UniProtKB/Swiss-Prot annotation:
Residues 1-64 form a transit peptide. It is found in: Plastid, Chloroplast stroma; Plastid, Chloroplast thylakoid membrane. It comes from Arabidopsis thaliana. The lineage of its organism: Eukaryota, Viridiplantae, Streptophyta, Embryophyta, Tracheophyta. The gene is HCF244. It is a peripheral membrane protein. GO terms for biological process: photosystem II assembly. The keyword ATP-binding does not apply. Its main location: plastid. One of its GO terms (cellular component) is chloroplast stroma. This is Protein HIGH CHLOROPHYLL FLUORESCENCE PHENOTYPE 244, chloroplastic.
């Protein structure tokens, strides 16, 4: 099997081009150039390439092939073997749990961290340490794997390109070189319509890169997670802290990550879905104000809402562009601006449900999800208050 070569733009940040732009544009991504042999650099350490490596700050070279990790040709791989990348995240952990419940052999790729992901081992998964920002750590994690489910995303303090573009390109190329049978990639709904937003452009370019890689794959675009609303609205309201909203009528069809995991594994078993682009959306699209109002009703108390006009986000984004050290902040503000514009992040699920053989009535609604959360948390708070009163004994 041929050794893998990483695209040159992974290490030369200034020469990237936009997927719809001419080659003279700068600062944009190019999924086509990633696939072009003349734009690749060897991953083998050699004396001739060492100076080039130093100039471009390339990570330690890595050979990505079956031979590189002592995988004998013809080694059988169980169809139930899955590698979940980003397994500790909001979606990743639900994928792991669902896959284990359905009898899959689950391996979890997680970054080395001071607090190990013991809960994944407790569930029955195997945990391996690797880092997408260090491509040389990837190949060993793919040995004996049939399917990769990619839930990974960069940390807030990292440049968006580090994991979400450079790391994903390296992972996809390693998967191709090592004969992975299927690759599931999660993207963002409408990412193809917002090339001005770095994160959405990256998602779209990764979709195209995966499509052209030749890997058997499924791409799933998502609108939003219900779980994210807990920290954003539910908890601050209960703690009588400010919640942040905008004056825009953006609507998002939030979906329970447990439903996303369930539908993903159904899609995984359906060979007719190979190579398809699916969009998963919740039963209804909600505005920020509607979500806040629902939380207020379920919590039984009013929210302290701080409204940020969309115009402020736009101005702030432009100001941060003046300073190199704030570029990543500006990238994230660009995404926030899209979320705060007059946009609907939703899609009809009729065709997808029919393809997967699922019933829309089985999907968790946002009302049900938040009602369960507030019921549980308010009961716990009530019990804690009762215990506190019982312990208040004065002499």
């Amino acid at each position: 099997m041929a050794s893998l070569r990483l695209p040159a733009q992974l290490v030369t940040r200034g020469n990237l081009i936009h997927h719809n732009s001419s080659s003279s544009s700068s600062g944009r991504l190019s999924w086509r150039r990633s696939l072009t042999p003349e734009n690749t650099i060897p991953l083998f350490p050699s004396s001739s390439s060492s100076s080039l490596n130093r100039e471009r700050s390339i990570v330690v070279p890595v050979t990505c092939s079956a031979a590189a990790v002592n995988l004998a040709p013809g080694t059988p791989v169980r169809p139930t073997s899955i590698l979940v990348v980003g397994a500790t995240g909001t979606l990743g952990r639900q994928i792991v749990r669902r896959a284990l419940d359905e009898g899959y052999d689950v391996r979890c790729l997680v970054r080395p961290r001071p607090a190990p992901a013991d809960f994944l081992r407790d569930w029955g998964a195997t945990v391996v340490n690797a880092d997408l920002s260090k491509p040389e750590t990837i190949p060993a994690t793919l040995v004996g794997i049939h399917t990769v489910i990619d839930c990974a995303t960069g940390r807030p303090e990292e440049p968006i390109k580090t994991v979400d573009w450079e790391g994903k390109v390296a992972l996809i190329q390693c998967a191709k070189a090592m004969g992975i049978q299927k690759y599931v990639f999660y993207s963002i709904h409408n990412c193809d319509k917002h090339p001005e937003v770095p994160l959405m452009e990256i998602k779209y370019c990764t979709e195209k890169f995966l499509q052209e890689s030749g890997l058997n794959h499924i791409t799933i675009r998502l609108c939003g997670f219900m779980q994210g609303l807990i920290g954003q609205y539910a908890v601050p309201i209960l703690e009588e802290k400010s919640v942040w909203g905008t004056d825009a009528p953006t609507r998002v069809a939030y979906m329970d990550t447990q439903d996303i995991a369930r539908l993903t594994l159904i899609a995984l078993r359906n060979e007719k879905i190979n190579g398809k682009l699916l969009t998963f959306a919740g039963p209804r699209a909600w505005t920020t104000q509607e979500v806040i109002t629902l939380c207020e009703r379920l919590a039984g108390q009013d929210a302290n809402v701080t409204t940020v006009p969309v115009s402020v986000l736009r101005v702030t984004r432009q100001l941060t562009r003046f300073f190199q050290w704030t570029n990543d902040v500006a990238d994230r503000l660009a995404f926030s601006e899209v979320l705060s514009s007059d946009t609907v992040f939703s899609a009809p699920m009729t065709e997808t449900n029919s393809l997967l053989g699922v019933d829309q009535k089985d999907m968790v609604t946002l009302e049900k999800y938040l009602q369960d959360y507030f019921s549980n948390i308010l009961k716990k708070l009530k019990d804690l208050k009762a215990q506190s009163k019982q312990s208040d004994i004065y002499f």
